[in-house]
Amino acid sequence: MELNRLVTEGRLQESLEIDQVSTLEMVRIINEQDKQVALAVEKELPHIARAVDLIAERLRAGGRLFYVGAGTSGRLGILDASEIPPTYGAPPDLVQGVIAGGLEAVFRTREGAEDSREQGAADIAARVRPGDVVVGIAASGRTPYTVAALEEARRLGCATVAVTNNPDSALAAAADVAIAPVVGPEVIMGSTRMKAGTAQKMVLNMLSTGAMIRLGKVYSNLMVDMQASNEKLRHRAVRMVVQATGRDEDAAARALEEAGGSVKQAIVALLAGVDARTAREALDRAGGYVREAIRLAQGK
């Protein structure tokens, strides 16, 4: 698809005078456009849900999740991947981000890196194995590096998902599931770090959060596999046990200590009325799902 025919490369009529208006009007124009992003993402919810189920299925079977992209899209993938271990207690290699140009490109643009199909295919081939799932991210849907990476992932037996802002793109064609929120032209023509990037971030939030919920790393709306690696998070762990069980802070803190800091284990112990060891055994039998572990610990 020619660049000038892409939705994301169009010229927004509402911002033609943005260089002449007051600062308040300037940010109002940007804000008005941003309001459209969530609505565009809403239209893609069925596809997002399919992708969540696909990712969870692969992860449950021992696969891993890879995000791949260039520029802003690549950085968003790395950002999302980096938050998974501390938030959900996942192994650091469970969700990984791959960016055109390597890690240096996270901080400084590597001109031309996105144009190499060969490097895109090579970067993915060096990392993935059959059973993994690869999410290609590109506003245009035509970035050579990302398209080639997704095509190579599919060839190697990975499940593939496309996150793009231009439907009917080469990236979408290489995906088992295509997610394409159409946010329209940017306030600054072609600056896809704006609405397109915001839409991508929202989609990635749903993909990773949804997958972690399906893997049992959330109980109610609590991140019960969180790694309490600092004082703030240790206090949060106590609060989560209090909120999940209705016990006071002293009881929650004791249960956490007996559970070796495991929020899940403390919750199961308190709600099932069992000791920490029994709670751990129930969680192991339940595959880490708190509700099922409580049922098993109670002998139901």
From Swiss-Prot:
Transmembrane regions: none
Active site: E83 (proton donor), E114
Database matches in Pfam families: GKRP_SIS_N
Molecular function GO labels: carbohydrate derivative binding; carbon-oxygen lyase activity; ether hydrolase activity
EC number: 4.2.1.126
Gene3D superfamilies referenced in this protein's UniProt entry, alphabetically: 1.10.8.1080, Glucose-6-phosphate isomerase like protein, domain 1
Family annotation (InterPro entries): Etherase_MurQ, Glucokinase_regulatory_CS, MURQ/GCKR, SIS_dom, SIS_dom_sf
Sequence ranges assigned to domain SIS in this UniProt record: 55-217
Keyword Nucleotide-binding on entry: no
Catalytic activity field: N-acetyl-D-muramate 6-phosphate + H2O = N-acetyl-D-glucosamine 6-phosphate + (R)-lactate
Alphabetized PROSITE patterns for the sequence: GCKR (PS01272), SIS (PS51464)
NCBIfam families linked: N-acetylmuramic acid 6-phosphate etherase (TIGR00274), PRK05441.1 (NF003915), PRK12570.1 (NF009222)
Leftover remarks: A lyase-type mechanism (elimination/hydration) is suggested for the cleavage of the lactyl ether bond of MurNAc 6-phosphate, with the formation of an alpha,beta-unsaturated aldehyde intermediate with (E)-stereochemistry, followed by the syn addition of water to give product.
PANTHER family assigned: GLUCOKINASE REGULATORY PROTEIN
Subunit note: Homodimer.
Protein name: N-acetylmuramic acid 6-phosphate etherase
Organism: Symbiobacterium thermophilum (strain DSM 24528 / JCM 14929 / IAM 14863 / T)
Gene assigned in the entry: murQ
